[in-house]
Amino acid sequence: MDLTDFKRDLSELTDRLGHAQDCLDVPALKARQQDLEQLAAQPDFWDDQQAAQKQMRRLDEVKAQLQQLADWGGAVDDAKATLELYELEPDEEMLTEAQEGLNQLRQGLDRWELERLLSGDYDKEGAVLTINAGAGGTDAQDWAQMLLRMYTRWAEDHGMKVTVDELSEGEEAGIKSCTIEVEGRYAYGYLRNEKGTHRLVRISPFNANDKRQTSFAGIEVMPKIDEEVDIDIPEKDLEVTTSRSGGAGGQNVNKVETAVRILHIPTGLAVRCTQERSQLQNKEKAMALLKAKLLVIAQEQRAAEIADIRGDIVEAAWGNQIRNYVFHPYQMVKDLRTSEETNDVQAVMDGALDPFIDASLRQGVDSPGADADS
């Protein structure tokens, strides 16, 4: 471990921490925590359950920010103490351990600085992510399932919870479509630029001649809207259909029509939910998803947004892709919007999406979802 490098890193990170403390305004955060705790102590606080839960989420968020700053400050103090000891009595192992602490601090500050770019109205919310197999037949359906695994791994690696709302299995392999909820702070902000067409090139495991196959899958991402947010949708604007939930066949097929699909006639938006046990629960879930889509359209106030967030049939094909995943004849994942790329395809498929997500946020990418989904 080079002492000069350690001192440089410590100085840089101390300055960055000071900037973070100024931006977050520690005295104001502490005052906010005190106000919220006093509010929560009121006898009638829980009379309105939804309002109380919202305030408790705000309190948890303030506490988390203060704890994060305290942890970062502790890391800097530990590094400074280590430096003083090292200059009195050099110990390479001690310095190496302190450098690891600074590396973790750098990662934390990098993440915080990135989250400052997530300033959209719904960036802090959870995400609803839908995957649709596109052109490519069975390979495309297999590709859709691979993407489901990739996003699930990414979410779990970031401490987020994944719940399947709807899943339609492929005839031979993979899935035709799937909708998942990703619950976690800034889930929508991180994932929103994943919207678009994802292209796979590989030797097809479903081709007896081992030919190279190109397959496509479409991704759409919506924020998970708070239940208290409501939109009045006239019943005449909705077309509700039901069907049986279940897999490819056998004793586990649901013989009751519990799956629900809702079409919003004026916009053509469609949502489907199959995972709940009752038709009523699936209808409530589908309505929540539809409202999220309509709310985003209303917030953007652009008719073109309808094409960006179209329903559950996605045309994912040549010329529309935002990212290529090449398994053969070479290995590379490349984002066509940011030029971010890596040769470690397996790591990406195991959920290592942060370099691509970070690049899209830092470069202010406008995800071309309309091209992918129209």
UniProtKB/Swiss-Prot annotation:
InterPro entries the record matches: PCRF, Pep_chain_release_fac_I, Pep_chain_release_fac_I_sf, PrfB
Description of post-translational modifications: Methylated by PrmC. Methylation increases the termination efficiency of RF2.
Keywords of this entry: Cytoplasm, Methylation, Protein biosynthesis
UniProt main location, coarse: cytoplasm
Disulfide bridges in this chain: none
Residues annotated with N5-methylglutamine modification: Q251
NCBIfam families documented for this protein: prfB
Protein family: Belongs to the prokaryotic/mitochondrial release factor family.
Record function comment: Peptide chain release factor 2 directs the termination of translation in response to the peptide chain termination codons UGA and UAA.
PANTHER family reported for this sequence: CLASS I PEPTIDE CHAIN RELEASE FACTOR, PEPTIDE CHAIN RELEASE FACTOR 2
Protein name, per record: Peptide chain release factor 2
The species this protein was found in: Parasynechococcus marenigrum (strain WH8102)
